[in-house]
């Protein structure tokens, strides 16, 4: 239910002088040297932390291009800039600067220039910049923003995807223009945008500039709107075709049948390479010699959280085999070894992302086990990996890891000065026996300046998905350190249904939304209070988003043990949620059918049907543009609470979707959330 591969880290540069002035005054009064000062994370600190993402290695493997994002409350938007750093180290240098936001850096095959997307001229366009110096050159004149940017192997052209009006002539009455939308099919909106009269298509354009040519002029979205990989548009090594992920079903709202198509650059008909699999295929990745195409596949149609297998297709014979047939874990981002004898895969395991080496005969070896590692990139000699690494007390930065020795070296340290002033504790692991008599794992973060002799309130964070997990990361939105900073112990339990603990564990939540996870969460509180004497079991609050928001509603109707609750974009009534969500395969899998074919399960697990039990004070957050869990879910819950006299507060964002991402709105979000916790947990 949470959007995959879309979490963005947001930050802003607040005035350093403005932040340090009150600290300076207080520390002078205490006669403490300013240089020794450390303080708990504040919102201004949080929004001021830069974010590192999207590392791209140069063709010779010597240099990493990457994106640094900073956010501004004044501008209420993020600004991306592209930076370069040598793999052997050195000071990173900024490649792009100016008023625009620059992203998607992609090296030309000869390594002499970088293509990227920028809105410096107004609408986002493709630009090229030479590594030898000079200004960036605009290479496109598009009406809508390009995405999925990639170079042809000969460096002469670029492929990308972009939204277009579809059909080209909608036949609207223009005598008296209106904003009316008319549709006949499902998937009329997705995530946070309306898709009526819009399609995403794949284009190719000369690197020298000119008109873009549509390679997919059909009534489908290329690449797919949902459940894609980190790469869903890529050239074949000979440059004659593009591999594109798309769902060609007549009604993509009810199925997960993404396929990988070979789309000829000359405009001839595409070939479906994965037609035999009715489930999700994505993320095509060719070996440079052209013999192999690796990709990811799920095998159960309609189940978005099925185990993701690593597949290998022989491009000569057409034979396909599964390299991970007997594994319980899912394969994330993948990359080829330089000798084409193995692939490397990012794999979520026990609340962290590790890196496995998987040979073409299916043998597996964990080669990076430390830390939480994303976006792996391999050096040309195959000896090292560049990764984006983060932890609950460490925002993302670039690291290079030598595979033979495990030696690590930091390549970027974009928040070094800011972090030196902050007091943040690392996440600690814990586990207990939960539902089905199975081990359940969690993370705990202590407040800054922790004193084991004190008693602290507990803030219990519940993840969405529900097939997801709370991981050891510096979360862009539900940041553990922000919750801990006012003086709370923060705990997260990866209940039955969570990812990273084997597919059987993940599967267990489907059709069991209110029993196994709820049992885990209640036993988790029992374990925490019994195990950690510094937790005050009489002052416990809980907060969750999406499925986590659903669980908050469920908890509110099942127990009175919490002092206060916070639900963000939660499901209150599963039956009415079905009629307003866009990806219908999700509730149909989770509840075993539609509301008219399996209504009993929708009724059984809907908190709305137990509204008479509501009594715990609750803060509800919901936004107008949330098309995953419609705004009406939050309104129904608020009505049920207030009609029965239960203290409640509603925070509404007219310009946000399932996530609150705009800088100023995030400020409001944190003010309200922390204020609610303080009101009920600090008494």
Residue ranges of predicted features:
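Short beta-strand element of the alpha/beta-hydrolase
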Residues: 446, 454-464
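Hydrophobic beta-strand positions that form the internal "hydrophobic ladder"
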Residues: 61-64, 111-115, 155-159, 239-243, ...
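Active-site-proximal cap/loop segments of hydrolase catalytic domains
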Residues: 479, 484-485, 492-683
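Short loop/turn segments that connect beta-strands within beta-propeller blades
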Residues: 86-90, 130-134, 206-210, 264-268, ...
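A flexible loop/linker signature enriched in serine peptidases of the S9 family
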Residues: 68-81, 96-102, 115-127, 135, ...
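The serine-hydrolase catalytic nucleophile loop
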Residues: 455, 466-480, 495, 632-633
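Non-catalytic accessory segments flanking enzyme active sites
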Residues: 56, 159-161, 168, 179-184, ...
